[in-house]
Amino acid sequence: MAGARGRVAVIGAGVAGLTAAYRLQRAGVAVELFEADARLGGHAHTQRAVGADGRAVALDTGFLVHNERTYPQLVELFRELGVPTRRSEMSMSVRCHGCGLEYAGARGPAGLLAQPGALLRGRYLRMLAEVPVFHRRARRLLADPAAGEPTLGRFLAAGGFSPFFVSHFMNPVVAAVWSCAPEVAGEYPARYLFAFLANHGMLSVTGSPSWRTVVGGSQVYVERIAERLTAVHRAAPVTAVRRHPDGVTVDTADGRRTEADAVVVATHADQALRLLADPTDAERAVLGAFRYSRNPTVLHRDASRLPRAKGARASWNYELPACDGGAGSVRVSYHLNRLLGLDTAEDYLVTLNEDRHRPVAPEQVLSRTVYEHPIYTPESVAAQRRLPELATGRSAFAGAYHGWGFHEDGCRSGAQAAHALLGGVLGGGANLGGARLDGVHPDGVQLGGVQLGGVQR
């Protein structure tokens, strides 16, 4: 058996797999990390561009920001790795191509009243008045276990909230945070969603944490973990994981077979299920309950994706095709200059699910990527409660789907997977180098007195 404490195969080099591999190796385990892509990091994805002045700039297009209050595992990891961070500006706007409304939060009255005549918009003023009502009723639901488990859509309908509030406030909150289509947002479990909002100070007009971003891009932390690992296999897609009484066997697409004492499967839930050659009934039921949304993403310099009113321009810019929200995908553009503190003449933006009727100017496109994000339903939330059942024997699972789908959730689940194996099949108890397994769930954005959520994973 290689290594003083055994040998573990870790499948997937996103934040969950990287954290698990790092924690296990620090505890004296021989680790082999397998990643299907040639690039490590998953949603920690830093791309490079050259500005008009000839300077190269690092641009994150996946995971962007974190905070000390709700990302304790990630903050601890960054501290250990010596990853430099800086403050980020967090604000969010909504732009409706139907009625022409543009407003932004966390930018004071200038953001909420960014357009001349905003105070003459009756539906908009009613929406602003409905926000504190929503906050109170959401807190009331959380405080009452007997209130049932309504979906967000049913909660809003029962509360008599206006269609304008739903389409111009509530849907942007959920859709921007979880990168889901507006019609999917209404199916989210209300209690689960409100617990997230409450944990991030987003069910009141104050209390949002201070946000930070990694200096030089999130790839900095990925590289610092990778250089500490002894066996990293890039462009090595795993085709099957077989478990047997004496260990596990990992097969890769190039025909290679790796033997290990245990395995951490740190992929999306549906991918993990496909990799298992012998899934148990519990694994089929739990992992099979998760669905994912595919979000085509464009990195570009087309500033027309921002609101026309300069006072409404924000870090997160949500677009509505029509007042009813319209069917289809979430459309949001992240203004990297604000989020990453870029000192450049050019505007750099990341747009999710660009509108084919209002496409990004082709000459301004720098790259295209597709990211997947978990979709939360009553079924997947119920399955999530059963995930600890799967961390038995010689296999453990990790991924952001273990929490709210964000970077902290992936980091925490990776540490927990390492902890489970060290305290189980690898024996000798767990020693994770001081890492804590406490903390609360992930991200959110505050809109000043009007709060909207949204933090890219």
Residue ranges and their predicted role:
Residues 68-195:
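Mobile amphipathic helical/loop "lid" adjacent to a hydrophobic cofactor/ligand pocket
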Residues 47-74:
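N-terminal glycine-rich dinucleotide-binding loop that anchors FAD/FMN and/or NAD(P) in oxidoreductases
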Residues 6-33:
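N-terminal Rossmann-like FAD-binding beta1-loop-alpha1 element of flavoenzymes
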Residues 1-8, 26-27, 49, 377-383:
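Extreme N-terminal leader/targeting segments of oxidoreductases
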Residues 4, 27, 237-372:
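Mid-domain catalytic core of redox enzymes
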Residues 195-253, 258:
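Helical element adjacent to the flavin cofactor pocket in flavoenzyme catalytic cores
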Residues 25-50:
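Glycine-rich FAD pyrophosphate-binding loop
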Residues 48, 104-107, 325-439, 443, ...:
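Conserved flavin/dinucleotide-binding core of flavoenzymes
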